[in-house]
């Protein structure tokens, strides 16, 4: 929670702490992100948390944290590395608070409101309003990660943030929207 509320101070402090961590500690936060995504899908589709839906959705939505780790590897691999990569993964995923809160809110809307009202709330208010806030706040947190945890200059931290987002979001969009993108592009081009 500290990283979500005070990312600069949190990353400054946590980056100085000695931590040789193992693979489990490096992967626990990405696995938690995948788990929250899986639970969100279960709650949206059935208005209930069922192990069958949440478990399978966790597995197939695990590409999101994997894509983020690919982007993180590319951004961390540029220049000198100040943190071991497992530690960088753990610290980076500690900053996923805005997106996790957004997903929990989305789940609550779909679980506690009728479908017609849920569509209205998620289209106008939640996707654009709260989603925009989560996007901007998470970008700031990620910038603080690159700036303070990896000890980068402001310009370098900004470039690393853009590189990470470009790589990870391109992978996520290609996997999630891949089947729908070519027909939509063809329709816009009049093919």
Where are these regions (language model features)?
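Hydrophobic alpha-helical transmembrane segments and adjacent short intramembrane/lumenal linkers
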Residues: 73, 78-167, 171-175
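Selected alpha-helical membrane-embedding segments in polytopic membrane proteins
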Residues: 1-90, 96
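Aromatic-enriched hydrophobic runs in primary sequence
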Residues: 29, 41, 45, 58-59, ...
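Juxtamembrane "helix-exit" motif on the non-cytosolic side of transmembrane helices
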Residues: 42-51, 109-116, 179-180
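Juxtamembrane boundary at the C-terminal end of a transmembrane helix
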Residues: 171-191
């Amino acid at each position: 929670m500290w990283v979500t509320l005070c990312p600069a101070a949190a990353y400054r402090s946590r980056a100085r702490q000695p931590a040789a961590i193992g693979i489990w500690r490096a992967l626990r936060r990405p696995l938690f992100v995948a788990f929250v995504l899986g639970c969100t899908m279960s709650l949206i589709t059935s208005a209930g948390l069922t192990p069958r839906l949440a478990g399978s959705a966790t597995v197939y939505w695990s590409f999101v944290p994997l894509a983020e780790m690919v982007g993180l590897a590319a951004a961390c691999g540029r220049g000198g590395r100040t943190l071991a990569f497992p530690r960088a993964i753990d610290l980076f995923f500690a900053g996923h608070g805005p997106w996790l809160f957004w997903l929990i809110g989305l789940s609550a809307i779909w679980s506690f409101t009728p479908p017609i009202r849920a569509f209205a709330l998620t289209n106008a208010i939640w996707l654009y309003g709260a989603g925009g806030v989560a996007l901007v706040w998470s970008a700031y947190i990620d910038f603080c990660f690159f700036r303070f945890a990896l000890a980068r200059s402001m310009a370098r931290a900004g470039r690393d943030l853009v590189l990470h987002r470009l790589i990870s979001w391109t992978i996520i969009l290609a996997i999630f929207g891949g089947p729908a993108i070519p027909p939509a592009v063809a329709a816009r081009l009049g093919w």
